[in-house]
Design a protein with these regions (language model features):
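Multi-pass membrane proteins that catalyze or facilitate reactions on polyprenyl-/lipid-phosphate substrates
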Residues: 1-278
Length: 278
């Protein structure tokens, strides 16, 4: 693992984690077609640090929302004398915490088949096909009527649908952010809120996955000599992640979310072609 290798992988992780173009798909393509070192080559701890970098990106961009969710959750349970309905209206950020918890539940259904899903990372042609499917989802979602629901009136059904889509998006090549944002738009969420909910929802998913991966990394061991390269990659992932989140927010608010579909179609087609050649 060289510094430049770490920088490139950190850049791909940071950009593709938040842009709706599938970070797992792009990292798998780099490994399968260009034989770059990734978690499967003994760099599992590096993979954990990359995801930690993107986790920090979300915390930096949405720190006000996170503080509000923590504060209002304590306030919600601290004001038990008020009727539950009144508390839900008075503390919308606390209500969003509940929706995020509900949206995370479908991920547990994937755990029994997680090993089989991970095997798909080695099938480059399949990843290309999923990138094309991601493009189709983005294109269709962008054509849907604009929704109006936010954390104040989001339904339990909306959270479960978005959560189910997040679980399906563990398939490599399907963008987690793209799939969940598209699902949010389809259920009638306001577009900027769909983006915000998708990224905040990923905090629990990424944190949970990192804890499991860190346990595996502890068993396989950590090469201390590679820590400088690992840390550089993590910082690059964090910085590029902040830029990527800002880009998604800007394009979605302007009604250009579907622009990413063209990239996914092109990347998917090229990936499928290269998989047949190499």
């Amino acid at each position: 693992m060289t510094i430049w290798n770490a920088i490139l992988l950190g850049l791909v992780q940071g950009i593709a984690e938040f842009l709706p173009i599938s970070s797992s798909g792009h990292l798998s393509i780099l490994q399968n077609l260009f034989h770059m070192s990734t978690a499967e080559d003994g760099h599992l701890f590096f993979d954990v640090l990359l995801h930690l970098g993107t986790l920090v990106s979300i915390c930096i961009v949405y720190w006000r929302d996170i503080v509000a969710m923590v504060r209002e959750t304590f306030a919600f349970f601290g004001n038990t004398r008020l009727p539950a309905e009144q508390r839900r209206k008075q503390f919308p950020a606390a209500r969003m915490v509940l929706m995020i918890v509900l949206a995370t539940l479908p991920l547990f259904l994937i755990l029994p088949i997680n090993d089989k899903v991970e095997q798909l990372y080695y099938h480059t042609f399949f990843i290309g096909l999923m990138l094309i499917l991601t493009g189709c989802l983005l294109f269709v979602a962008d054509k849907m009527p604009k929704g109006t629901r936010t954390e104040k009136n989001m339904r339990v059904r909306d959270a479960l649908i978005i959560g189910a889509c997040q679980a399906v998006a563990t398939i490599p090549g399907l963008s987690r952010s793209g799939t969940t944002i598209a699902a949010g738009m389809a259920t009638g969420l306001e577009r900027s809120f769909a983006v915000r909910f998708s990224f905040l929802m990923s905090l629990s998913a990424v944190l949970g996955a990192n804890i499991l991966a860190l346990a595996k990394a502890a068993k396989t061991g950590i090469d201390v000599s590679l820590l400088p390269a690992y840390l550089v990659g993590m910082l690059v992932a964090m910085a590029s992640g902040i830029v990527a989140i800002g880009l998604v927010k800007r394009l979605t608010s302007k009604g250009h979310f579907g622009a990413f579909s063209y990239y996914c179609w092109g990347a998917g087609a090229v990936t499928m072609l290269l998989s047949l050649i190499f």
